[in-house]
Amino acid sequence: MATAEAQIGVNRNLQKQDLSNLDVSKLTPLSPEVISRQATINIGTIGHVAHGKSTVVKAISGVQTVRFKNELERNITIKLERLSEKKIKNLLTSKQQRQQYEIKQRSMLRHLAELRRHSRFRRLCTKPASSSMPASTSSVDRRTTRRSTSQTSLSPSNSSGYGSVFGCEEHDVDKIPSLNGFAKLKRRRSSCVGAPTPNSKRSKNNMGVIAKRPPKGEYVVERIECVEMDQYQPVFFVKWLGYHDSENTWESLANVADCAEMEKFVERHQQLYETYIAKITTELEKQLEALPLMENITVAEVDAYEPLNLQIDLILLAQYRAAGSRSQREPQKIGERALKSMQIKRAQFVRRKQLADLALFEKRMNHVEKPSPPIRVENNIDLDTIDSNFMYIHDNIIGKDVPKPEAGIVGCKCTEDTEECTASTKCCARFAGELFAYERSTRRLRLRPGSAIYECNSRCSCDSSCSNRLVQHGRQVPLVLFKTANGSGWGVRAATALRKGEFVCEYIGEIITSDEANERGKAYDDNGRTYLFDLDYNTAQDSEYTIDAANYGNISHFINHSCDPNLAVFPCWIEHLNVALPHLVFFTLRPIKAGEELSFDYIRADNEDVPYENLSTAVRVECRCGRDNCRKVLF
């Protein structure tokens, strides 16, 4: 003990002091209680013990700074906090103030400890690179470059102002690995530090420490040291498990985004720059209030949103603020990117609700459509949902002023004479003076547009497998309800390829009188959209009834217009022969590819009689079909 005391020059005449009886107000710079020739100072604000050498330190005096040598024999000057007598008395008398003071000191401790760790990392970077680099970084250009006045050519440690934060000297800056060769880096297979694999090899690194190397071709991230910018993109200085610090490399975010060390890195820096990040976020949120929800962003960007990108940008901005950097170009670029990320983040909340609403509508729709093939709903264009006032139905709703059709009293007897109904038998179409509608082998329509379809009914001798029973079995093709990109709203496309003459679906809605349809049509024309379909197959007189699919309907509600359509509308009678109340059904006019949008001509301009369609000329509506023969005006 005596030897140790002699070595450090302890005054053996010092007596243990009773601090409770110590009158702080009477202490002076020359008081023996506060003076030591060889001082050991516990500098709590930088997180380590500094040993003063040949330095007289006065803990309570007019001295404002202390100069000492650190463990690397570098001169360090630390500014001491000078407490007033009033504050000292308050701390001694108030336990609450002492606790608040200690909390503040601990916060400073965490902040400066992080800065010290970065400073240590920078010193390691000044060591010469080893010749045995990992295989994936053999092409890295490690030539050092002199600091340039151009911010884009700076090494990563300077682009965010680390030089001013860590107090490094100018000659240290020149030795930091440059990012000039970053573009040549090959992507590593990064993985998280975990249990050693059976194939791990043991080797000595340059420090003489035994380290376990991962299998050949794999490199494990041991630690992410810092983040900087290269051409306005974040890059990370990575320490690899089993390799010396001199073999650290700069990696892009894509290379290390999925590593667990990235989560630790982000969490650590968010705590370090908590105050700066909070202030920056508040500033960006004020700018965000003035931006429309989806201005200059796409649904694809919303779906691909990653919170990590925003977190990294906020950390980069905080580093610039903390360093007092005068650079404007880089923070501006990062700020614009962070603002867009926050805009996308805001839209993502709306997107989640939208997808939930669309999924619910899809579920209800397919429940109504059973047992028909499912219909998929998707919107990759905007954040719109299906109108909540629209009710999906399976069969037509008969209005109060519309008479209910009476059941037919006539049915064919084809199976009594032959095995099945064919074009050569006296089937239902023959009774109405029309042609047999379908080909027997393919079940495809064999009629031209404008013809009528008469199917077998419940009074016919044939069963449900009859080739003249197609529409009554319902939709048999899968479809997709999607949002169009040309401003036409929702549309319908084929999920699979369709042949010419295939039945697609029936036009379903409310069957109302023509007088009521005229009243509703005025409101629809004002909105530039109509769902009124006149049941006027009998052209000898005006139509008596109209189908309105605006508020009640099925998938046909969403089929758009085209001047060159791939669908045609046919009138069809099944259980009754009331000419004024046919079913309106859609058949394909030509082969349709999978994914092709389905459309029909709302206004048959090639036919002056204009059968089945409701014409409205009150408002001119632009046609957006984009076909070569487009009439430019819909109605």
From Swiss-Prot:
Which residues are Zn(2+) 4-binding?
Answer: 563, 623, 625, 630
Which Gene Ontology molecular function entries are recorded, alphabetically?
Answer: chromatin binding; histone H3K9 dimethyltransferase activity; histone H3K9 methyltransferase activity; histone H3K9 trimethyltransferase activity; histone methyltransferase activity; zinc ion binding
Residues forming the SET domain are 477-603
Q: Identify the residues that bind Zn(2+) 2.
A: 412, 428, 456, 460
Catalyzed reactions per annotation? L-lysyl(9)-[histone H3] + 3 S-adenosyl-L-methionine = N(6),N(6),N(6)-trimethyl-L-lysyl(9)-[histone H3] + 3 S-adenosyl-L-homocysteine + 3 H(+)
EC number(s) stated in the UniProt entry for this protein: 2.1.1.355
Highest taxon listed in the record's lineage: Eukaryota
Q: Which residues form the Pre-SET domain?
A: 410-474
Q: Where does Zn(2+) 3 bind?
A: 421, 456, 462, 466
- Record's compositionally biased regions (Low complexity): 128-139, 147-161
State the protein's purpose.
Histone methyltransferase that specifically trimethylates 'Lys-9' of histone H3 using monomethylated H3 'Lys-9' as substrate. H3 'Lys-9' trimethylation represents a specific tag for epigenetic transcriptional repression by recruiting Su(var)205/HP1 to methylated histones. Mainly functions in heterochromatin regions, thereby playing a central role in the establishment of constitutive heterochromatin at pericentric regions. Involved in heterochromatic gene silencing including the modification of position-effect-variegation.
Q: What name appears for this protein in its UniProt entry? A: Histone-lysine N-methyltransferase Su(var)3-9
Q: Which organism is it from?
A: Drosophila melanogaster
The taxonomy runs:
Eukaryota, Metazoa, Ecdysozoa, Arthropoda, Hexapoda
Gene designation per UniProt: Su(var)3-9
